[in-house]
Amino acid sequence: LILLADTGAEQPHTYHFIETMDAWLRDRRLPEITVVKNVDRYGNRLDIETECLRSHTLPSIAYGHKQCSHKHKIGPQDKFCNNYPPCREVWARGERVYKFVGYDAGEQRRRDNALKYDLADKKYIKQYPLIAWGWNRDDCIREVEKAGLPQPGKSSCFFCPSMKKHEIETMRTQYPDLFLRAIAIEENALPYLTKVK
């Protein structure tokens, strides 16, 4: 099972790469990516852009928190797994499901910060194969190229406050409609901002 959580605001290259990756997986008789989304109890889509506009806020990372990833990435994946029969069967036996996390060898600090939560997790055994193999970002890029795949590009919302200046400039020139939507989110939140980190 390969899961990807769609926040409803991914950058265009991410959506394109899903199609490319699915074709690559099909050619190798591997399962395609299962895309999950944040929904309410009635099945209505809850995307992060609409949430920011309705609440007159920016993504939580602008305020020093990372709740957007928890709510729109981790939450939908956990909800899917909670209802996925193979996972339920493993848990019914009192065992844990293996979950593979794609942190590269340069991100060991992130893995280390998650360790106490990973050890306490009753449902999942987290594995970090890229770290175990010693693959840094350059190694990962090389392996992606060796597999005949294009580079996927950075996965983030098109209005993520963590974007670098060159990423914003690229979006402004390549996707002016998304750039204007990102500006609209900021302008919508501006009257309510008192402090931003």
Region locations from a protein language model:
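Nucleotide-activated chemistry modules centered on ATP-dependent adenylation/adenylyltransferase
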Residues: L1-K197
